[in-house]
Amino acid sequence: MSNITGLTNKIIEDAKVSSKEIMDDAKKKEKIIIDEKVSIAENERKLILSKAEEESKVRAGRIISNANLQVRDMKLSAKIEVLDNVFNAAVEELSRMTGGELLNFIKNTILLLDIDGDEEIIVGENEDRVTTEFINEINKELNAKGKLGKIKLSQKRIKIKGGYILAKNGIEINNTFESRVKSLRDDMEAEVAKVLFS
């Protein structure tokens, strides 16, 4: 019986040693698995933080870019408003011409035009300085230049700040102050902007 007791004790001892080895091995494997999972979780945390930081930088960049665009648009709008004011002031200044200055402007510009001389002159609705006598003077000078000299003052009046339109057969030569300043603006806007904004 002592053999059986000894054998049983030996089996129990071996089982204890074996279970201790199994437990130690399991603890080592458990530590390795936990360390791996912690490492993976830490890497994912870093990746998530990195992505969040990158996204916030991109978002911040977009916000800054949009703000810069808005500022640029506001500056551009302000510059356009200033240019509008400058060219509108030019039209207003022209519209304050004296009667003599206006008549000289009309006569001189008509005499420079390549026209037949039988057009109709249309002036502003409140313009009373352009008279039939004045048109007759222009016609005499047109005759002297070999033109027909039959320009007529139209009964039709238009809403303009000053100047005139010559019309014949549906074709118009627009020499209103607004049109002349617009034409000058197209040619000079970059130059004027350079003077104003540099």
From Swiss-Prot:
Q: What is the phylogenetic placement of the source species in the record?
A: Bacteria, Bacillati, Bacillota, Clostridia, Eubacteriales
Biological process according to GO: proton motive force-driven plasma membrane ATP synthesis
Q: What does this protein do?
A: Produces ATP from ADP in the presence of a proton gradient across the membrane.
GO molecular function: any one? Answer: proton-transporting ATPase activity, rotational mechanism
Keywords of this entry: ATP synthesis, Hydrogen ion transport, Ion transport, Transport
**Superkingdom of origin organism:** Bacteria
What's the name of the protein? V-type ATP synthase subunit E
Output the Gene Ontology cellular-component terms.
proton-transporting two-sector ATPase complex, catalytic domain
Keyword Transport among UniProt keywords:
yes
Similarity field: Belongs to the V-ATPase E subunit family.
